[in-house]
Amino acid sequence: MKSYKQLSKKERAALYAELMESYNEYVKKGLLLDLSRGKPNGSQLDISNGLLSVDLTKSYSSRAGVDCRNYGLLDGLPEMKEFFANALNLDKNDIIVGGNSSLQLMYDTLSRALLFGVHGSVKPWAQDKGLKWICVAPGYDRHFKMTELFGFELLTVRMLPTGPDMDEVERLVRDPKVKGMWCVPKYSNPTGCTYSDETVRRLAAMECAAPDFRIMWDNAYAVHDFSEDKDELADIFTLAEEYGNKDRIFYFSSTSKVTYPGGGVAFMAASANNRKQITPYLGAQTIGYDKVNQLRHLRFFGTPENMYKHMLDLGKVIKVKFDIALSKLDELSGLDIAEWTDPKGGYFISVDVMKGTAKRVYDLTSGAGVTLTPVGATFPYGIDPDDSNLRLAPTYPSDVELALACEILVLAIKLAALEKLGI
């Protein structure tokens, strides 16, 4: 079919009536379908069930003989640090192993910065007024909510196919009130974008007016490739060291979507200066995280290579989901009413519909029993200035449910576009 913009008003009205008839048939079915959150379903979690049968009863000690059932080792098992370092090309000495949640580590990191400052701070951040934070959008709603909760003014920077609009980022960091920015550098939520080498280099090299500016580098999807045909991400620490800016980076990741979202292992990585400043406060907060779970993961995987194989098995299953969603979205090709991403990994598809129609699409899909991520969630303050972005999370529904939900979504996008163009 030709572009909707090329249809006459009479043609649009006839098409709208036909599509609305189909829509009403879906409404009558009383469906309950969910495309709103990026989480694995039961069959994907089953791939990690070997984790539950790891027998620790014969040996619950670390390599150095530490009883993992007891207190101690504030920053985690040395072999867990080595595992993450080898898997993600990090320095093992930079790593602090946490509990199951990298988001909690991020929250704690910002809390400490507000209460005590960071290395290079003149005073605790909370003693300064009018602090600002760069948020790349579309982006991760929980990141935005966290910095909003802490009282930062959120500054929106556009996400481009190569990553953040670096011209805008470099302009904003000239303001000493701008203390940091969020980055999901590989298979970014929700666009699936991986930052280009140039973008990573510019982030590492840029001059910041605030001497204690920090990049929260949330590498959540570091190994979440669908196949061997994957995106490669430049090494932020190597580049930051090259420009003398290693202190700038707070790096986070976890096994949340590698094994179990509620039972994985999270970590942060930071420079020696940052770790020296962090550790005393961390020691006041906890005597140590769950070493039994660290040991369980180490014995389940054994080597990073085994984890990569595990992730390729998981990636094959998830790619089927993405292929189903993308095949349905292809029905919109040539209509000039929507664009969408086709990532090589991660958990999300980003759909941009006609400006001013995303909320209407949301209402239509909701009316037919399909739950989407609320419109605006991918932007600071929950406001999409163009009312155009939708985030799809294909991983959780069954294949049949996913196909049905995407059919309804496509129908809603068509109806909303026709309403916008005039019928």
Task: Pin down the residues of each PLM region.
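N-terminal "arm"/small-domain region of PLP-dependent enzymes with the aminotransferase-like
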Residues: 2-75, 79-86, 367-370
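Conserved glycine-rich beta-strand-loop-beta hairpin in the small C-terminal domain of fold type I
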Residues: 312-326, 337-352, 366
